[in-house]
Amino acid sequence: MVQLAPAAAMDEVTFRSDTVLSDVHLYTPNHRHLMVRLNSVGQPVFLSQFKLLWSQDSWTDSGAKGGSHRDVHTKEPPSAETGSTGSPPGSGHGNEGFSLQAGTDTTGQEVAEAQLDEDGDLDVVRRPRAASDSNPAGPLRDKVHPMILAQEEDDVLGEEAQGSPHDIIRIEHTMATPLEDVGKQVWRGALLLADYILFRQDLFRGCTALELGAGTGLASIIAATMARTVYCTDVGADLLSMCQRNIALNSHLAATGGGIVRVKELDWLKDDLCTDPKVPFSWSQEEISDLYDHTTILFAAEVFYDDDLTDAVFKTLSRLAHRLKNACTAILSVEKRLNFTLRHLDVTCEAYDHFRSCLHALEQLADGKLRFVVEPVEASFPQLLVYERLQQLELWKIIAEPVT
């Protein structure tokens, strides 16, 4: 479904009316996508890297040695409270005007007069070009060290990439795909969920977790840095094989925390897990026992784009929650996508609206065994991955508790 231009432009994606491309890949320059192979169905597979905005020391302190999530020191952009000029706090060069000096008590009228010359024209006080000027005409320019929240244009993929191994997540993925293959791409909801997992290390550390609709496996890779075991599940041998390759590419991350990632098939439209040993990525009886005996966390990212599949996801969540021996928490990420529809002649969010109705139905479920508590998660936690955190990106938490 992806058409490639010949020769030098072979990594340029040609859009078709029946393909979908994630914004994560759309806004990434072409030269950062390294085409590595063709998958079993003939789709080009690309390799991209995602940089974690933390230092090696922070990783060691917070992850490998069991620190709390508050120990993770991130690189944060300048605060919006420092004024539109971007001046650091305390510099005295905010929105007050360059002619004002710290500690001077002046009125607005005096400020206006100070900025006019003898002819009544505006006299703009300019900062010197460099702090080394011997006779500056005004206050010296403060040294500012900007924080760049993006990869450099000359980024190199592969072993030559700069940074420690714990700073980089390498993911194989496809580009523009039909709707049924969107799991082969990386979506913003997976990056938001990964940020939350890194923030709530106390929730994930030492647990057994299961991801539904894992796709490329990015969220499972992050979870494995803290969890004891992560069951990374989806359907389709080709997708699961690519997911397995991504687990191997990032095995050093899971090894730091001692976690294990098991890639397995889990079909939401079936009640039972596949145990046929002849089927790739099937379940053993030992794995099924471990899943039901120890799992306390379920999570899923960006799997709510089709109403029938959304219904299947919630049925699977309910079924798993009833079979687990322990109370569990489910973390779901979703992007509220706005579309203009001819049927309504208005901007609607039908897939999101159906997702919310399913949340409400689950919360109202009363079978005498489990009680489901649904609550939104405020996306105010630190951002450790480079992506655009839109207002339309949401996290929801579902707590399944036994009825007492």
Curated annotation (Swiss-Prot):
Lineage: Eukaryota, Metazoa, Chordata, Craniata, Vertebrata
GO cellular component terms, A-Z: nucleolus; nucleoplasm; nucleus; protein-containing complex
Pfam family, one: Methyltransf_16
Gene3D superfamilies referenced in this protein's UniProt entry, alphabetically: Vaccinia Virus protein VP39 (3.40.50.150)
Compositionally biased region (Low complexity): 79-88
Major place of residence: nucleus
GO biological process assignments: protein methylation
Protein source organism: Homo sapiens
Annotated keywords: Methyltransferase, Nucleus, Phosphoprotein, S-adenosyl-L-methionine, Transferase
Protein name, per record: Methyltransferase-like protein 22
Localization per record: Nucleus
